[in-house]
C-alpha cells in the first residue's frame, strides 16, 4: 500500500493518493486497488490501514517530502503494529515514473478492474502541470517498492474469492466484492 499524502483538507487540497499493488513470483505486477480520497490526515490514515489489512499487505509506503514523520505517527495511531516505510523523493516525478512506465511498456503491469481517476491521471499528466498527480504518485511508489525487491511476492491464487463480475481478486475472508458489490455466494 503506497500513500502520497495531502497534509491539508480544504476545497483546494489535493487528494491523498492511496494505491494497493502486488507482485507475483512470475514478475507480473498487479494494481489491486485505488482508495485515494480527499480527507483529513486521520481519515486517510485509517483508509490506508484498512487497505493494508484487507489486502494483507507487507507494508505501507509513504512519501515523506510533504508529510515528514507525520505519516508514520498517524498510521501508528490507527494501528501500532502496521509495518511502515518512509520514502523521500530526491528526483522529479517524471524521472521517478520512467522505470514504472517501462514496466507498463513491457506488459508486466496489470490493472485488476478499472481505476478511472488513476488511469486518467496517468494519461493526462505532464511535468509542467501545477496540480499534483496524487494517485499516480502513489502508484509509482507502490510499484517502485515492489520492483526494488522491498516487499515479498503475492500469490493471487491464495486470494480465493475471484469476482466473476469484475475480475477483482479478494481476500479469502471477503463475502462480497468490494469493487462492484457482487456477493460471492451469488456467483
Model-derived regions: residue spans:
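RNase H-like, metal-dependent nuclease domains and their acidic two-metal-ion catalytic environment used
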Residues: 1-87, 109-163
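Conserved beta-strand -> loop -> alpha-helix junction used to position metal-binding or nucleic-acid-contacting
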Residues: 81-103
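Alpha-helical elements of the RecA-like P-loop NTPase motor core of helicases
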Residues: 69-73, 98, 178
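Short Cys/His-rich micro-motifs in 6-15 aa windows
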Residues: 181-187
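Short Cys/His-rich "knuckle" micro-motifs
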Residues: 172-176, 187
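Residue-level signal for mature regions of secreted extracellular proteins and peptides
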Residues: 159, 170-173
Amino acid at each position: 500500500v503506497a500513500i502520497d499524502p495531502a497534509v491539508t483538507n480544504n476545497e483546494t487540497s489535493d487528494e491523498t493518493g492511496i494505491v494497493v499493488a502486488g507482485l507475483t513470483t512470475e514478475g507480473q505486477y498487479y494494481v489491486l486497488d485505488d482508495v485515494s480520497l480527499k480527507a483529513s490526515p486521520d481519515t486517510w490514515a485509517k483508509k490506508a490501514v484498512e487497505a493494508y489489512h484487507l489486502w494483507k499487505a507487507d507494508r505501507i509506503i509513504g512519501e515523506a517530502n510533504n508529510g515528514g514523520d507525520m505519516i508514520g505517527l498517524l498510521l501508528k495511531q490507527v494501528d501500532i503494529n502496521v509495518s511502515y516505510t518512509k520514502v523521500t523523493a530526491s528526483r522529479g516525478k517524471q524521472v521517478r515514473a520512467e522505470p514504472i512506465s517501462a514496466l507498463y511498456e513491457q506488459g508486466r503491469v496489470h490493472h485488476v478492474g478499472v481505476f478511472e481517476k488513476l488511469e486518467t491521471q496517468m494519461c493526462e499528466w505532464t511535468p509542467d502541470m501545477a496540480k499534483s498527480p496524487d494517485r499516480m504518485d502513489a502508484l509509482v511508489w507502490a510499484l517502485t517498492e515492489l520492483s526494488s525487491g522491498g516487499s515479498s511476492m503475492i500469490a493471487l491464487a491464495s486470494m480465493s474469492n475471484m469476482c466473476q463480475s469484475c475480475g477483482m481478486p479478494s481476500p479469502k475472508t471477503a463475502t462480497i466484492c468490494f469493487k462492484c458489490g457482487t456477493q460471492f455466494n451469488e456467483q
